[in-house]
Amino acid sequence: MLFRSLVQFAVVAYMGWRWHNIAVDGIPYQWRCVPRLEVSAFGTDYVRVVFPEDTTQWKDDTPPEKGQQIYVYISRDTSGLMEIQGASASKPFVGGDYMQATVVSYQDGFVQFQVGFDRYRMAPELTDGIYNLQPDDSVIASIRMKRGEGVIEGIFVNGIPLENISNGAAMAKARQEKEAQTLFDRPHLVDTGMVPPKEE
């Protein structure tokens, strides 16, 4: 039992260190995404992030196999969004950006892939903003990439953090504004400039 707890702690600690390392030194990217609510094995809430742009041209002569690790070549377009430039069993030449992925399927020269950074942790009370998303909303994941691995720093809906469009965020903001109201800001029953008449 103790060994299992130590292993779980070590895994969580390593993931935390890896996330911090990539977040500090990684190259920033923006990628279109669709957030979904799920619950992890540890019982904490998180957002499952689906990336619709998950299919690209296969650059090699030998077709990939399902489950194989591949390298997806990436760049940025003029607006700063990530562009997928194809995939291969080999890393790109020096200077080329890429992300590691796993093959989901292959057909007619195109490979469907899945990346390893498909989760984004959020406080449970702030996740309900997902239900307010509209089909025409611009939903972007802010990502950092380093040596093929990535982490999601944030999810933005029309430029606003996903956390900020939740009912929980609205309630917290209203609570803060109410607490910030000082005694002097509150309405008084008697105006301080008025003096009650002297009784005789």
Feature annotation, model-predicted:
Residues 72-75, 82-87, 95-200:
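Extracytoplasmic/periplasmic terminal helices and flexible tails
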Residues 32-63:
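Short extracytoplasmic
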Residues 11-33:
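Aromatic-capped interface at the extracytoplasmic side
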Residues 50, 63-76:
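Anionic-ligand-binding alpha/beta catalytic cores of soluble enzymes and soluble regulatory domains
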Residues 26-28, 46, 67-69, 79, ...:
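Extracytoplasmic
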